[in-house]
Regions:
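Conserved functional micro-motifs across diverse proteins
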Residues: 1-39, 43-126
């Protein structure tokens, strides 16, 4: 999908991803009863001279209309999508994790920048 400064691609998703997170580091946040981790894999390419990017502009929304923010502290998982700067044509790819209610359906990944329009991606069922 095209945003003013970026091309954003949803490369894949894994649900549940709780075992991935908990096996990576015993100190990662354990989801509350009735919740689970979802992992999305995203690629972001800069379309202008220079971009500052953060994965914290992504969130997940499902059938219950609840907005789930990304988990900030997930340790021990290789390939996390990290904040940083890119020059035109540069790409950052990686994983972002969310804790969502089990049974929540129709998950959508939302790119919600401070300035500009939101972009939505259907998260495939896995």
């Amino acid at each position: 999908m095209e945003a003013p400064n970026y091309t954003i691609t949803l490369d894949g998703a894994t649900r549940p991803a709780t075992d991935i997170v908990m096996n990576a580091n015993m100190f990662n946040t354990t989801p509350d009863e009735g919740f689970e981790y979802v992992m999305v894999e995203i690629s972001v390419t800069c379309k202008i001279d220079e971009c500052a990017f953060t994965p914290y502009n992504f969130n997940v929304i499902g059938s219950e209309s609840v907005v789930y923010d990304p988990e900030i502290m997930v340790a021990g998982v290789d390939g996390m999508l990290e904040s940083g700067k890119m020059l035109q044509g540069g790409t950052r790819s990686g994983k972002v994790f969310f804790i969502v209610r089990e049974g929540e359906t129709d998950l959508v990944l939302r790119w919600d920048p401070l300035l500009g329009d939101e972009i939505f991606f259907d998260i495939p069922e896995t």
